[in-house]
């Protein structure tokens, strides 16, 4: 607690050194006995209220807002400012509980209400049917690369993977340790700039495959499935890594056996992994499956088998509430399409000064990679953009160039500012 009695750094009182009666009081810098604290502890209040309040959809413009940058990072990524402000207001005292969410027992009634509401709001957002289970897990989407085959098939089960980028490739390689994986299509030879046709002309599915796996949006290369393939096996099902476009648009959950996503790109901070899995697929884990990867263990314990990432789940809940307040995912998708169109138009209308290599039909609404015709200027572009408070525009190390990640929480104003900068930069260097 800061005390305003003096501008001296000695106002931390006894924190500086323990009392020693042998020392000269003048040397230990104790304040006089008649010193009075202007703001005693008993007068500290918290802006949080005992009852739950909706996250405001209007971002408060103040000095803090003006000091914030436009963050185009791929993840962890920008969060809605009004959500951050809501979390700030509840940090010390969550809704009259007298404690922070960070301090709560994960088995207490307070956190139970938080995780239950987060799940309920997510179910509303995605219209998740009752025959699907929602799990809040840890370990990132990368851990699910192992958990999925361990839970959904035997070591001899055939499974198909469509590889449209680095994450799909990593998922297939990891799954090969636990199942008979076939990468039935890969875009690697084309540098992952497209998605195959589903009419059977470009790949052939195994009719016995237990599941078909896709990465719905490849963060690094900026390719996104606009429609989804149907497994050739009538008893098979579709599995999707939706980490980087989760809750960015409506999705028919019933078309999937399992959806998984790391939260840190679109719905929260890093540390939370969300799995949406059809109930009949739970309970068939291979014997070798570690307890922390067993969906049944987590489902039976309502994501509380061990201590979950409580604060991360709380933040996800605030984001879900905010998305609902915006009108749901139909409205969110409209905003995302508008933002992406502004940026892609600027690239396409630059007469080749900027280039996006991805086929237009599958360009991501979330991650926009682009290069400069004069590649030697890319470093200057990134540095000058940072001076204008637009950060994290450097492309992935495996690709180079630039990448603007424009997730749900990136406002249109951020994209418009980037486009204005791009035009100015082009005029200067064309």
Swiss-Prot record:
Q: Where in the cell is it found?
A: Plastid, Chloroplast
Source organism per entry reads Spinacia oleracea
Give the pathway: Amino-acid biosynthesis; L-serine biosynthesis; L-serine from 3-phospho-D-glycerate: step 2/3; Cofactor biosynthesis; pyridoxine 5'-phosphate biosynthesis; pyridoxine 5'-phosphate from D-erythrose 4-phosphate: step 3/5
The beginning of the lineage is:
Eukaryota, Viridiplantae, Streptophyta, Embryophyta, Tracheophyta
Q: What cofactors does the UniProt entry give for this protein?
A: pyridoxal 5'-phosphate
Q: Is Chloroplast included in the keywords of this UniProt record?
A: yes
The family classification in the record reads: Belongs to the class-V pyridoxal-phosphate-dependent aminotransferase family. SerC subfamily.
Specify which residues bind pyridoxal 5'-phosphate according to the UniProt entry for this protein: 141-142, 167, 219, 241, 264, 306-307
**EC number(s) from the headed UniProt entry:** 2.6.1.52
Kindly provide the name given to this protein in its UniProt entry. Phosphoserine aminotransferase, chloroplastic
- For this UniProt record, give its keywords in alphabetical order, as a comma-separated list: Amino-acid biosynthesis, Aminotransferase, Chloroplast, Plastid, Pyridoxal phosphate, Serine biosynthesis, Transferase, Transit peptide
Pfam families named among the record's database cross-references: Aminotran_5
Binding-site residues, L-glutamate? 107
Q: Which GO terms describe its molecular function?
A: O-phospho-L-serine:2-oxoglutarate aminotransferase activity; pyridoxal phosphate binding
Here the transit peptide covers: 1-51
Q: What does this protein do?
A: Catalyzes the reversible conversion of 3-phosphohydroxypyruvate to phosphoserine and of 3-hydroxy-2-oxo-4-phosphonooxybutanoate to phosphohydroxythreonine.
